[in-house]
Amino acid sequence: MGRANGKRRNHRKNRMNPIQKKGFLEQEIPLNNSEAALPLLSRLDNPEIKERSWACSAISNIIASCTEGRLYLLKNGLVSKLIDRISDDSVEVVVEATGALRNLAIEEGYSICMDMYRKNVLAPLQIWQTKIVQTLDEATEGKNVLETYEDRSTFSCLCAIAENISSLLVNLGETTSQVIKVLNQKNTLVFLSRLLIPEAKIPQSVQEMALQAFFTLTDDNDDGIITWIQNSSDFALKTINQIYLYFSYPSCLVRVYSIGIIYNIYQSGFVNKKMESVVKGISLFDSFIPEALPILSDLLPSEENYRNLVRQVYDKDTYFKTKKDDLTLSSELLVIPATLELISSMTSLLQSLADGTDELEEQEDSLMEDEDLSYMDDMSNVVNEDENLIIDEIPSNTPQKGNFKLVEYMLDHVLPKVITYCVVAFEFSSEEIPSNLSNYFQEVGDRTIECLNNISWSCNSVFVESSEAFTRWKLSAGKILQWIFQTIFLRLGLGVWPFSSEGFTTACSLLWSVSKPFPAEIQVLSVDDISTLILFSSTHGSLEAQSRLLGAFGSLGRCGNIQINQLLGQTLMSCVIASDPNPLLAVEALNAIFDVYGDKSYPYDAPVFKGSGYLSQLSEALPRLKNMVKKIDRRREKHLRFRAEEALENLESFIDYKHAEYAS
């Protein structure tokens, strides 16, 4: 479908990293001199605890503050030396060593995380996980009341280690499925769940990080969830109940990660047969999405509040005076992309349920949205692709009835907020801003487009034209269509797309979805808008983006502007009559042609379709298209082969139909 799916592992690209944990040193060593950092490595083996602890802390500070120094240390065996220090006899040294590894994983990402994994970082970490769980169990059972200063100090250090380990697990969990498999085998979710029980009196910062790690490690990890529940059934259910209570927690990060964890478990019940009975057996899941959506909506600020949140952490004059590389983003800012991600995933699941479609079956072929073939009612021998049912004809206990109100809520409460976020980001585009703020704006932009896209497709899927909600959706779709060309597509003519390449693909899908409700009334676009978009897509867009754009042309082409129709018609035909047509593009172009030129009464049919000789060109292209279909591997590309065969069958009927239509 045109919607962006929930991306069940791996990975949600550009997800914001957890906040860094810098060491206690700021400028005790010259950060601009990488060679000055090298002696710190030898001090990691110093017999004095204070020396080892100081060295770890200093290295942690270099990792977070000095790129040159960090790379210099990495070239000299930093990772192995820090992993060795996790087994240090001193808990204070372990705190600093795990903190340094935490910063290193954040700064260097995938490559260093995989290096840590290959160097067996999980082995010493698991030893500490066992110690932490044992201490927490003793505390909750009253066996360790932390009466002495030493006990409280040790407990504080263990909490710091737990936070650092949780942060490392977040980053390791974003690497590969193999790493996830090993983490499952080591019962990592059991460890994280122990950090969430309030009786343990864990600091909030540790809980936030543990929740984020739990969220990451339950994302598309059905095996891990099943193992966790099977190995600790009663405690797992207790944890789920506790996570539900966190929905009303004061911390916005606690709320969003708690909802994310429950969503991951909830979703598993629909896509994994082994989890289905587990989810159905937990009554709290019955009203999960209706309860979670308003909470998530409240976490999304208004346009003005969003602007103020950015200004609170970034002041241009102050920033250039301090000359810091990065800003510390507030929790209120960090929660926005996570919230958008969750709403997008929930919306995708709701649409899958409404369509009666298993989300897993759509992962590889998510481009296709059911086509409107109502114009071909007289063509009885054409394969009808539109098999969507009308809500009023469905029993009240079907997903469509239950999802109507949820999608309506998103239309009224989520969409108006989300559409403003890119505008705020563009206000800072002319300024020289810190790199992490720039990355943040890009992620929020990508998440915004994805969220708008999924809500839009759900509105198309759930609302019927006779409903008042569809009328509101139609108005909103028109505004989004204008917004697309006036904001995110504004600088395409200069070759500038402000977000990721995946974001552009999703934007093309969004254009497709919002053009569907009112194809005959589109008056907001110009020939320049369309030609610029076509040129940019052909030079910068992926095949997936181009195919979604062709899908959009199936609606945009039905506007009353003959010049626009002529431009779109040329583009669609070029994909079909090519000497060696690309099947993905050809199939989508054919379906759009059926939509646009299905009736000779359309004002553009005679001057464009008939006048340009498209009918004869389609007839001439038939042999090449048949050969194209035969080349599609039925085993590797089953869905594409099916759609291509269907489009080819429809084309033959369409050609006969148009000949008969013109002869009448």
UniProtKB/Swiss-Prot annotation:
Transmembrane segments: none annotated. Its main location: cytoplasm. One of its GO terms (molecular function) is unfolded protein binding. Signal peptide: none annotated. The keyword Transferase does not apply. GO terms for biological process: protein import into nucleus; ribosomal large subunit biogenesis. It is found in: Cytoplasm; Nucleus. Disulfide bonds: none annotated. Keywords: Cytoplasm, Nucleus, Protein transport, Ribosome biogenesis, Transport. Forms a heterotrimeric complex with rpl5 and rpl11a or rpl11b; interaction of this complex with kap104 allows the nuclear import of the heterotrimer. Component of a hexameric 5S RNP precursor complex; this complex acts as a precursor for ribosome assembly. Nuclear import adapter that specifically recruits the two functionally and topologically linked ribosomal proteins rpl5 and rpl11 (encoded by rpl11a and rpl11b). Guarantees that this cargo pair remains bound together from the time of synthesis in the cytoplasm until delivery to the nascent 5S rRNA in the nucleus. Belongs to the nuclear import and ribosome assembly adapter family. This is Armadillo repeat protein involved in nucleocytoplasmic transport Syo2. It comes from Schizosaccharomyces pombe (strain 972 / ATCC 24843) (Fission yeast). The lineage of its organism: Eukaryota, Fungi, Dikarya, Ascomycota, Taphrinomycotina. The gene is syo2.
